[in-house]
Each structure stands twice: as structure tokens, then as C-alpha cells.
């Protein structure tokens, strides 16, 4: 059942709110007085809340579920002279619900809402559109507090002061298996830096983050009514869009990349990715950076902006983006990623594009990560002695990869071999990359020749075991399937499914499809990545095309349970009916919530 406070617990709409950066295991260990041995070794003792989308991608984590793409095209590069917008969040399937929300007081927004929220998070109205991408901004910090226990209570050291630790008891009702409720009470602690979330040796650790849920909720809703860029920027003065960047376009022809607009000012000589000394007042936040102080790109001469969870320093290409040297290091802790490289390769040479062309860009088949990864493999194979047993075994697969255009396709054997090999190579070097926090693609490309070749042997063996032959087309492996409306879906190789060509964003696929064998299957089934996708043109009237993974109903057998699946699998976006006459012409009927559906 919905309760009003729930909206305040998740007020900005992203994949995970800022509070999700706090690790529950460490939180539980602190409040249950359990040892934190797992956090006291190696990188485990580093900041528990710095994992952001682009860093996870660099480390080779399952990135297809935590990425997003946004492109905005100005009249300079639009065939129609109208601004265009690509809205392409990568989330868990069915986590974004497509809706058109109207009121008699000026609300008229279309797009995707996150479960449990009442505002359109990524979408458009009649004259403006917004796409949010997870940011690598460093705006969540940890402060190590020196705790002093005295007879009259708990204190923490701050400069020459001893300040009291704020203590509060939180009461939580817990539902039992039989439907009854029990009441549990938990003590909580906080300092002026924020709540205590874990311990680091004998110090307590407070987390500092954006704690303005009411303002964040107002900003999230108000921006859906913004008519143009000026109104959108005015709403951003709330500074509560903390974990996301924005790609924007409007009917006046404006486009913009807008960096996360919650960026605390702090010392640039300290590494805030690690906990800092909370007893030193000079480590404190010193207010927030203004919008003008952020690495935005507004109406650049390129005629386009893009963000793929990469850094802001390529938002408008190599010549016209913000310059990294002009900003403190905490302004963005990410880097370029494979999707960003892919986007730049498409946008920089582009002369002009229309709405259909924007769809083509969004589903471009190139996998640029393999441009970096495959040459070292080819060298390793070429250096094998002619009489080496592996030479004959691997030669046919190497020939497939050498002839491959490095573009995905459902009938491509090379796509399957490359991805299986890439997965095996990533597994082989994962621990080294994580331990040193090195870029995963770089570590893979620099792996020893023997490691490269062993990964290919492992990939071919896995293909033969799972599918009978290593020469299996990618579409026989990579599938879309929806059998129920459950949140935790089950998959079945014997049940109907659809081939999907696009793949993990780790390889640079702009259209992302996070697939893997699941619950004992041989085939790979996607459950994250492209969820809601839309392209929008802002002319005298707004035009849009969109697609949602599977369908909008969660009820198997309902006409809308999987009616979009075939279109989704091939990137065939349908027309959006935005205006009343179009809605009336295509409606099956009307009803109010609680009434039987037509």
C-alpha cells in the first residue's frame, strides 16, 4: 500500500537514490556491533559509497543495468531545423513505466516513471524534453569521526571542540510471515557531517550527501512542467538533482548537457574518494557550486551534446566541451567509456539527422571495445609457433574474428565468439583490475599472450558445451523472454523467446542488453539495459517515437503483456500519440483506476 512518506525516500528518480550508496552490510555490522573485518583489508577499507555508474563500467561490473544514453541535436544538425532528443535509460527491465500524465493545471508530460514515483523522470512535454544519465560526480563523502565517551554522553572531536553526537531512536514496524507486525527500535547516531553508517577501526564514519528530499521531490516534479531551457535552469537552482546529469532539448532550438547540480565545494588537494578526517574543520563542505561553475555544455557550435555516463569533458566533442583542467578533480571522478567513444564516432562527422536517423544512431551496431581488445589477441596468435597444438585449434575462430566488421548481428558467429572470449578474458583479469582500480578494458588489452589465448580456448569450449558447436550465431544465444510478471523473472530454454542482436554496453553497444545464462539456462536472457527508449522532435507540434521492453502490463495473457517485444528486439520504435485527437483515434476505451479495464 502506498503511503505519502514513500515518495520522500526516493525523491530524484534515478536507478538508485544516493542513500543506496551506503552499504547495508557495513551499516548492519556497525549497529549490531559486529566486526568489520571484511572492510579493514585492501580496497575494502576505502570509501563504501563511491561506486558510480562509470566507475562500475570501468571495473567491468554489470554495466548494462546502470548506464544510460542521452543525445540532443540542435537545429544546426537537424534536417528539419527542429531540436531532437534521444531518451535511452539503461535499467532493470520493467523498472521504468511508460505513461502520459496530464492535469488541468498545466501538466502534460510523457515518458518513463520509476516505480513508486508520481513524476515523469525521463521524458518530454509539448516544448521541452529531459534525459537523465547517472553521473560520476564525487558528491557523497565520508568523514571519520573521533568519538569521545564521557559520563554525560557521546561526543566527537571537531577542531578544538567536543561536540555532542546526535542520538535518535527509530521505530520500525516489521511485517511477519503470518501478516502480523512487530515493532523494533534502533538507536541511530549522526554528526553535523551526516548519519553514522559504519566504523573504520576505532573511528566512526559519517556519510555526507544531499539530504533535501522535499526540495528534490519538488524539483523532480517541477521540471516536467518547464517550457524551455530558461525555466529548466531556474528549477535547477534547487540543487537537488544530485546523482544525475541531464541532456536537454526544447522547441526554441536549445540543447544542453547539464552536469549534476549538487556539487559541494571542498578542498581540491584531498582525495574525497576516501574517508577524510572529520575532526579537521578544513575538510568540511563549503557550500555548493553554482550551475555556472559546473562543466555544462549549452548550445555548443557542434550542434549536439551527448552523455553516456562518461565524463563531461567530451559532451560536445573534442573541441567544444568543457576542459578538465578548469575544474576541481571532484567535479567528476569518471572517465571516457566505450559508449562515449562510440557516440563521438557517430556524432562528430554527422552532417544532419532526422528523427529516423536518430533511431539509427541509437541502435548503431558497432562494438568499439573490440577495436582495442582484438589486435593483441591476433598478435598473440600470430606469435604462436607453427607446430603449437593451439595454432590449429584456434585458427578457424581467429579467421572469423579477423574477418568480422566488429558490429553485432543476430546471424553473426563472430559476435558470439568475441563476446564469449571477452567475458572469459575479463574473468581472468578481474581481480587484478579491481585490486588496483585500473580500467578494465586496458587491463584486458594488456593481458599476457597466454592469457589472451587461454580465454579464447575457454570461450570456444563453453560455446561447444552449451550449444553443440562454437559456430553458433549470436541470435541463437542472446534472447528476450518474458514468461511472468514477477520482479525476479525465471527463464526457460524450452519456452518461446526472441533473438536480440544488441549486447552489453561494456563492449560499447549504445543499445544495451544485459544478458547472461539464468537459473540453469544455456541461452542468455536479458533482464536489464534498454528499457524505455524514445526519440523526440520539438517543432510546431511535438513528435515522438518510443518503445518499452516487453509491454506495460504485468499480467500474462493481457494484450499489453508482451505486445512490444518483437519491436523492442529489433529497435522498431512506434509512434507516440501525444495530442487528444490522436489519443482518441487510437484508444480502446477509457477507465478510472479500480474499474475494469476495457
Question: Where are each of the predicted segments found?
Answer:
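Long, compositionally biased non-active-site segments enriched in small/hydrophobic residues and glycine
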Residues: 1-46, 250-598
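Loop/turn elements at helix/coil->beta-strand transitions in domains of secreted/extracellular proteins
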Residues: 81-82, 126-128, 242-244, 302, ...
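Substrate-recognition/specificity elements adjacent to catalytic centers across diverse enzyme folds
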Residues: 1-96, 104-106, 111-119, 424, ...
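Structured core elements
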Residues: 72, 85-86, 129, 247-248, ...
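Glycine- and hydrophobic-rich flexible loops that cap the catalytic core of alpha/beta enzyme folds
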Residues: 65, 104-119, 123-128, 132-281
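Active-site-adjacent "gating/activation" loops or surface patches in catalytic cores
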Residues: 63-67, 76-83, 87-97, 197-215, ...
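Generic recognition of flexible, low-complexity loop/linker segments
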Residues: 57-61, 69-75, 82, 107-110, ...
